[in-house]
Amino acid sequence: MVNVSITTDYSRMLFMRNTKSTLKIAIIGYGSQGRAHALNLRDSGFDIIVGLRPGGATEAKAQADGFTVQSPDQAAKHADLVAVLTPDMVQKKLYEEVLAPNIKQGACLLFAHGLNVHYSLITPRSDLDVVLVAPKGPGALVRREYEIGRGVPCIYAVHQDLSSHAEQLALTYAGGLGGARANIIKTTFKEETETDLFGEQAVLCGGVSSLVQAGFETLVEAGYQPEIAYYEVLHELKLIVDLFYEGGITRMLEFVSETAQYGDYVSGPRVIDRSTKERMKAVLKDIQDGTFTKHWIAEYQAGLPNYKKYKQADLEHPIEKVGKQLRAKMVWLNSEKTNDTTHPMSSKVV
């Protein structure tokens, strides 16, 4: 895949300029990403409609932001591009019952995550362009960076190209979000979906949370104070992740002590070894062949019994009780919560 700089491609710049004045975009959903997309695109000169259930919790918020709010079916009827920015598990029903009967012929259907299309939960009409545009950051960050004249990198993909302009539409949309100010990378629905799920399951969410819990349990079972264990395996994780974020693993190693570096080199591979990688491959295989998605759909349709059980077990883990007590004394956290509503995974919560 290649990085794309649309600012250096005159034909794409011309397409974007000409499209702004004519393209009507319907944003379906007004959560973290939906609101950021709608505001940024409007500020970039596009005509925006927001599609929401009448009387829903976000309708008043969208209206307060100055948007025309219509029901999703009406918004789809009037739009040239329909951006589906709702949670994954409601998209199939939304598309089949609301969007498919109403979206006009030749319009563009846009997703911010490829799960439903990649696993054929949604089969878009053949008379539509179908694209993906995903900012690599939470909605609050997408909006904040745009407002100060910068942008969050975006990835994009094309699934169907009826008009022969689907790629340019995706790039135009990404540019309207501010992505062209940073970086835009071409991908596929398959690559975006499978890597996104793998990252969440094996590293960012599943991997890290299980590692932290295991580290906490190891220290407490060895007789160390739970409070000290919490600080060492969870609280200080932010310091390390911030360094990762700024400059990768090598930057982190530059800023920790030589003792910590040596411990990294000799003990890290004892915890995360070749067998870990083999289990990661098994997780990836379940994602690639659709096993995970099949199980997730069955779980959702059954009313989430196991999901609720897993969630309750996490809530009851001793690290949560200790953490709650310690965080109550961290007065700076309250001010951070007040001033910053950004959560890294909220890019999925729309």
From Swiss-Prot:
Keyword field? Amino-acid biosynthesis, Branched-chain amino acid biosynthesis, Magnesium, Metal-binding, NADP, Oxidoreductase
Q: Supply the EC number(s).
A: 1.1.1.86
| Pathway terms, separated by semicolons | Amino-acid biosynthesis; L-isoleucine biosynthesis; L-isoleucine from 2-oxobutanoate: step 2/4; Amino-acid biosynthesis; L-valine biosynthesis; L-valine from pyruvate: step 2/4
UniProt remark on cofactor binding: Binds 2 magnesium ions per subunit.
Query: What cystine pairs are annotated?
Result: none
Q: Identify the Gene3D superfamilies for this entry.
A: 6.10.240.10, NAD(P)-binding Rossmann-like Domain
In this chain, Mg(2+) 1 is annotated as bound at D196, E200
* One example GO MF annotation: NADP binding
Keyword Protease listed? The answer is: no
Any idea which residues are catalytic in this one?
Answer: H113
Query: Do you know which SUPFAM superfamilies this protein is assigned to?
Result: 6-phosphogluconate dehydrogenase C-terminal domain-like, NAD(P)-binding Rossmann-fold domains
Please state every residue range assigned to the domain named KARI C-terminal knotted.
188-333
Obligatory cofactor(s): Mg(2+)
What this protein catalyses is: (2R)-2,3-dihydroxy-3-methylbutanoate + NADP(+) = (2S)-2-acetolactate + NADPH + H(+); (2R,3R)-2,3-dihydroxy-3-methylpentanoate + NADP(+) = (S)-2-ethyl-2-hydroxy-3-oxobutanoate + NADPH + H(+)
Q: Specify the KARI N-terminal Rossmann domain's residue ranges.
A: 4-187
Positions with a binding annotation for NADP(+) = Y30, G31, S32, Q33, R53, T58, D88, M89, V90, Q91, G139
Q: Where does substrate bind?
A: S257
This chain's function reads: Involved in the biosynthesis of branched-chain amino acids (BCAA). Catalyzes an alkyl-migration followed by a ketol-acid reduction of (S)-2-acetolactate (S2AL) to yield (R)-2,3-dihydroxy-isovalerate. In the isomerase reaction, S2AL is rearranged via a Mg-dependent methyl migration to produce 3-hydroxy-3-methyl-2-ketobutyrate (HMKB). In the reductase reaction, this 2-ketoacid undergoes a metal-dependent reduction by NADPH to yield (R)-2,3-dihydroxy-isovalerate.
Q: Which PANTHER family match?
A: KETOL-ACID REDUCTOISOMERASE, MITOCHONDRIAL
Which family does the entry's similarity section mention?
Belongs to the ketol-acid reductoisomerase family.
Q: What is this protein called?
A: Ketol-acid reductoisomerase (NADP(+))
Gene that encodes it = ilvC
